[in-house]
Amino acid sequence: MLSPPTLRSRLAPGARPVFNQIPGVSRHGRAPTLALLEAHQAMAELLTIRDLHVRFSKGNGRLVFALNGISLRAREGEVVGILGESGSGKSTLAKALLRLLPRTAHVAGDIQFVGRNTLQLSECEMNQIRGARIALIPQEPGLALNPVLKIGDQVAEVLRVHRDWNWKRCKAEAQSALEQVGLLAGAGRRFYDAYPHQLSGGQQQRAVIAQALVCEPALIIADEPTASLDTATEAQILDLFRELRAGRSSSLLFITHNPDLLRNFADRVAVLYAGRVVETKSVDSLFENTRHPYAKGLLACVPAQAAKLALGERLHTIGGMPADAETPTRGCSFAPRCNERLDKCETQHPEMQEVNDAEAVECFLYGG
């Protein structure tokens, strides 16, 4: 009987997993040539989004401006946090990457995934990518799972669609995938044969994570995967993501409204507001030296900051109302809520400015 292959990267006995190493660099630290560095950078670029716009038609000539020129990249093995409040465009971005937007959506821009513009692919070609090369972990696992099918069969079905395997092997792989995410057989119960309503919220989330990982995709999009979970279960799921990250080269876009979830987890963070990336930086720099006024306000709002407040002092909030997606502004979208705005912020839109090699901010305060 065939033993089900593990979901983790295949390594020779005694070999150590190696990620993000530059070809030409020896174990003894010999420096590579500039050509090798450039070749590695091109090879490591997995996803590149350039000037992505998404608008929805609402009838009567009205439009909703959901994404307004997003540019973003993700390299192989990198965890990129997508941070923003409700309505900032996070979930629209996830659906745009998978081409799952409704027919009312008008999409423009460029999405390069492993060198191919996914916006120009046929639906048949896109079906070969969804679930196999790019996988989605939704924020509502209870709605994503089919209530009348066994959990294991739903994971196995992903393999049946994308692999030329018989059903027996698909089931064996699915069982292995469930075990990888902590849904272990035993105690008189097999999670493979359970139905969604028989699982807790955390177990359902583990099941959809198994669905996403079973084909070993190059890119995983986690759309607020802990939003519907209690605090204890949320911590368990985050620990699971950290464990799964070790030993695999998949890239992860982790979408959240909570900056604390990205701490000690993400490599880089892109902060979204009104359908635009307003700041990108390393996760350490995000907590130590945030620049954009919206990003600073968002960090000040998280519950973890409550411990720093004096007795009777109120938790910080961002004043004003979020930007109206149906009414695009002439200037900076955050200007009506910004305490640091300049006169030109009302009438001109800042450009993204590189602060250094790892950081960029869209704000006139930094030369935008």
For the regions a protein language model found, what residue spans apply to each?
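Charged, flexible cofactor/metal-binding loops and thiol motifs
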Residues: 1-40, 188-189, 282-368
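P-loop NTP-binding/switch modules centered on Walker-like glycine-rich loops
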Residues: 13, 229-310
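Conserved ABC transporter NBD signature motif
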Residues: 106-117
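Conserved ABC ATPase "signature" region
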Residues: 117, 169-190, 299-300
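Conserved ABC ATPase signature
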Residues: 190, 194-199, 203
